[in-house]
């Protein structure tokens, strides 16, 4: 903890980037991961799911992905990207609220669940939906993303990596 704007920290002098991580993947040691869940498979593998900014330029743009890390012996961790492409920041709430609606279940494989923001949230196009002008839907830009979007719950069945 720091009480002098980061000039010093209590709790030891180890650089936090050198502390154990849920994965030993090179890019994940220096990027953001958050809202994690953990579960064990039937055969004893640890699975950990979380939002992740290690892909592309997510750390700079604020976009994110969902990842799954796994280990059998807790010494070496593997990581799998669960999302097929990065998600823009959420746009529904002022201030960029990102719902913490995540979860993880496991049996033979892992079932991570997350709030996905890749689906645009269309609105009624201006000047439509009136007499003589049939309604049309438009996708509009957002202040913090290329388009307004919805947070939808996604679930995937994913083999747990071993590392």
Question: How would you describe each model-predicted region?
Answer:
Residues 1-163:
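Extracellular, repeat-based ectodomains that mediate carbohydrate processing or recognition
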């Amino acid at each position: 903890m720091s009480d002098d704007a980061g000039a010093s920290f209590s709790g030891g002098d180890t650089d936090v980037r050198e502390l154990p991580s849920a994965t030993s993947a090179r890019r994940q040691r220096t990027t953001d991961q958050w809202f994690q869940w953990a579960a064990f498979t039937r055969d004893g593998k640890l699975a950990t799911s979380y939002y992740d900014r290690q892909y592309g330029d997510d750390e700079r743009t604020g976009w994110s992905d969902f990842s799954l890390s796994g280990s059998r012996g807790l010494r070496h961790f593997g990581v799998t990207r669960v999302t097929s492409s990065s998600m823009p920041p959420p746009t529904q709430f002022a201030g960029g609220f990102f719902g913490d609606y995540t979860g993880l279940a496991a049996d033979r494989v892992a079932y991570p669940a997350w709030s996905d923001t890749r689906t645009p949230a269309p609105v009624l196009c201006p000047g439509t939906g009136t007499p003589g002008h049939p309604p049309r839907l438009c996708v509009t830009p957002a202040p913090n993303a290329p388009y307004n979007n919805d947070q939808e719950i996604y679930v995937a069945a994913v083999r747990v990596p071993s590392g």
